[in-house]
Amino acid sequence: MASQPPQEPTPTATSTPSTSALASLPPHLDPTTYPRTLTSPTHNIHLELTYSPLNPSQALTHTSSPAAGANVLFLGTTRDTFEGRAVSQLSYTCYPPLALKTLLDIATKAAEKFRLEGVYIAHRLGVVPIQESSIVVAVSAGHRGMAWRAGEEVLEEVKARLEVWKREEFVDGGMEWRENRERDAEGKVVAEKQEERE
């Protein structure tokens, strides 16, 4: 993950950045140039980066297949606290060409490894309020075991590899850029706990 994320606009649902403000933004930071999508018909893969709210039903529609006996859907949502601090919202940014390339690699490898009928990954950018989804992962497979394992692996690969930067914004006015890492019930990074034991 890059050490310093690119700066981004923080559009809200109630206001739209002015045309003159957007004209000065590079295209990858301009919300009006989204959604950015990438598909691979070979493996029934659909990938999306968007500033709009995510649609879980759309994810299941994309992964639907007559050969699928199992569909797994994961929604990652913004929670209201982090390490005891009240969170007001999250904000995400990325460089789409690189992010879509990484997502395609993750989805293609999972489709081949788990013999998936479909893979859908959508990541929201910009401001994501409390209780709204920042990521949707859906997979379909012939049987539930493959679908469960594939869904989890796709999510963990996205968290580990995707070039998306997350800014946690707090009610007290503070903010922190964070890496997407797996945390335990106390909020501690799981990888760090494993390293401490070794």
Swiss-Prot record:
One of its GO terms (molecular function) is molybdopterin synthase activity. The keyword Glycoprotein does not apply. Residues 1-40, 176-198 are annotated as: Disordered. Pathway: Cofactor biosynthesis; molybdopterin biosynthesis. It is found in: Cytoplasm. GO terms for cellular component: molybdopterin synthase complex. Keywords: Cytoplasm, Molybdenum cofactor biosynthesis, Transferase. The keyword Transferase applies. GO terms for biological process: Mo-molybdopterin cofactor biosynthetic process. It catalyses: 2 [molybdopterin-synthase sulfur-carrier protein]-C-terminal-Gly-aminoethanethioate + cyclic pyranopterin phosphate + H2O = molybdopterin + 2 [molybdopterin-synthase sulfur-carrier protein]-C-terminal Gly-Gly + 2 H(+). Its EC number is 2.8.1.12. It comes from the Eukaryota. Gene3D superfamilies: Molybdopterin biosynthesis MoaE subunit. Substrate binds at H143, R144, K159, K166, R167, E168. It is an enzyme of class 2 (transferase). Residues 1-27 have a biased composition (Low complexity). Belongs to the MoaE family. MOCS2B subfamily. Heterotetramer; composed of 2 small (MOCS2A) and 2 large (MOCS2B) subunits. Catalytic subunit of the molybdopterin synthase complex, a complex that catalyzes the conversion of precursor Z into molybdopterin. Acts by mediating the incorporation of 2 sulfur atoms from thiocarboxylated MOCS2A into precursor Z to generate a dithiolene group. This is Molybdopterin synthase catalytic subunit. It comes from Aspergillus clavatus (strain ATCC 1007 / CBS 513.65 / DSM 816 / NCTC 3887 / NRRL 1 / QM 1276 / 107). The lineage of its organism: Eukaryota, Fungi, Dikarya, Ascomycota, Pezizomycotina.
